[in-house]
């Protein structure tokens, strides 16, 4: 009975922490969203592709009224789904999922022209990303306070707020990246596979279905998502071979294969889009020379660290790897093997993605937005390492330990919120 009451109390605390996290996140987003101004041409393309007859429905050397522009950017009776799909295929640069979501928002908004048409989609993705980060930290540290503070620390960063404020697909892309990371965190917990009860089997199936859903959503939002998949699958193979869990490699591969089937059924235009758009030649040319650029791994790392830590990036170029190294030393022993594997996968995938995207993207197209999802991985690795180190070195238990850990969480929030040049 006492155990039941304790569990109920713990669940209530988690619920309160979760609700507080969501509320704070929503306030953050709405605050910055109210100051949003469209200053980037691609944001106009978002509205054009969803609501117009073509990619550029503006006539040169002809007077166009305000209503002409408004009609091109808002949903009307003559706008329909198939027209939007045709626009996406003509554009050939991005998959359709984000545009479909904005199409739904535009249909609900009607002829009202507002930045919140696109930001509403980003708001759900921003809050969803926060929820997933909360669940990841809950899984690793079993602390409502750390889960809440760590999540707020992530969402308060310049990079996450900028992703949310950009009326493009990168916040949704970040959401699916977070979901994919969470699915990998669950899949890499091999202790959970020991029990073979019906409930345990269903839970195992569920985590691979989650993995599959994340891959489908991620790839249908941004084609670069495939590099995250390749990186995490590579680490899964390495760990499973090391632990002689060859069946787990097969499970993971089957989940990816099922995802590939769904992707091809839902959007079979992906291959044409990737190989024949205006930038394909440059990307493919860079891909053929990728092994000649192995020496530039550092530049990919430097780029993403600079985007995450802003003015403090020079210090964090050294501090971040030192932090990870200290984590590996402090969190030694078999009892910490799970959290070490999680950090290895997240930090390793972040580095690999930064390198590949930096090499493949033509220099003229290189932009912060391609790295927003990767920045989330860097932030996760950073926060997990800090919390794990504090957890190991603070020997005192109970309230004293929770106090120290809370202080660590607050420090992370202060660090992350020190530079707020958000792109609005």
Predicted segment positions?
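Specific aromatic-rich, kink-prone transmembrane helix
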Residues: 104, 132, 152, 156, ...
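Transmembrane-helix motifs of polytopic, lipid-linked glycan transferases
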Residues: 117-141, 179, 329
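Transmembrane-helix signature of polytopic, membrane-embedded enzymes
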Residues: 133-156
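Transmembrane alpha-helix segments characteristic
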Residues: 148-150, 210, 253-257, 333-360, ...
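Hydrophobic/aromatic-rich transmembrane helices and adjacent perimembrane loops
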Residues: 173, 227, 361-399
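Hydrophobic, aromatic-rich transmembrane alpha-helices
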Residues: 237, 311-341
């Amino acid at each position: 009975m006492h155990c039941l009451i304790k569990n109920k109390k713990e669940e209530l605390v988690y619920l309160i922490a979760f609700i507080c996290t969501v509320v704070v996140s929503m306030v953050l987003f709405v605050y910055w969203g109210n100051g949003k101004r469209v200053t980037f041409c691609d944001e106009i393309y978002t509205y054009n592709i969803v609501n117009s007859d073509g990619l550029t429905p503006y006539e040169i050397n002809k007077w166009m009224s305000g209503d002409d522009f408004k009609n091109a950017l808002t949903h009307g009776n003559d706008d329909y789904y198939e027209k939007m799909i045709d626009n996406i295929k003509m554009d050939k640069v991005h998959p359709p999922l984000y545009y479909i979501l904005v199409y739904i928002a535009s249909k609900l908004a009607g002829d009202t022209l507002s930045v919140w048409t696109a930001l509403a989609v980003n708001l759900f993705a921003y809050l969803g990303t926060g929820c997933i980060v909360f669940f990841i930290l809950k899984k690793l540290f079993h602390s409502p306070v750390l889960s809440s503070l760590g999540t707020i620390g992530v969402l308060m960063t310049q990079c996450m707020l900028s992703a949310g404020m950009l009326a493009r697909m990168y916040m949704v892309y970040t959401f699916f990246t977070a979901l994919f990371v969470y699915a990998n965190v669950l899949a890499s917990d091999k202790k959970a596979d020991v029990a073979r009860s019906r409930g345990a089997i269903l839970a195992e199936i569920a985590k691979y279905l989650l993995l599959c859903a994340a891959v489908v959503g991620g790839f249908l939002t941004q084609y670069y998502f495939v590099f995250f998949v390749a990186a995490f699958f590579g680490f899964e193979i390495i760990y499973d071979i090391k632990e002689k869990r060859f069946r787990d490699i097969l499970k993971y591969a089957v989940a990816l294969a099922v995802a590939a089937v769904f992707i091809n059924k839902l959007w079979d235009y992906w291959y044409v889009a990737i190989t024949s758009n205006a930038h394909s030649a440059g990307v493919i040319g860079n891909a053929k020379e990728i092994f000649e650029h192995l020496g530039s791994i550092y530049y990919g790392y430097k780029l993403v660290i600079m985007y995450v830590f802003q003015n403090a990036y020079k210090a964090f170029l050294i501090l971040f790897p030192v932090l990870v190294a200290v984590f590996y030393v402090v969190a030694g022993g078999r009892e910490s093997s799970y959290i070490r594997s999680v950090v290895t996968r997240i930090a390793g995938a972040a580095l690999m993605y930064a390198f590949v995207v930096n090499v493949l993207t033509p220099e003229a197209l290189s932009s912060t937005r391609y790295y927003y999802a990767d920045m989330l991985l860097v932030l996760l690795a950073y926060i997990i390492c800090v919390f794990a180190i504090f957890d190991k070195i603070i020997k005192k238990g109970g309230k004293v330990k929770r106090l120290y850990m809370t202080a660590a969480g607050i420090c992370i929030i202060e660090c992350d919120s020190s530079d707020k040049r958000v792109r609005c």
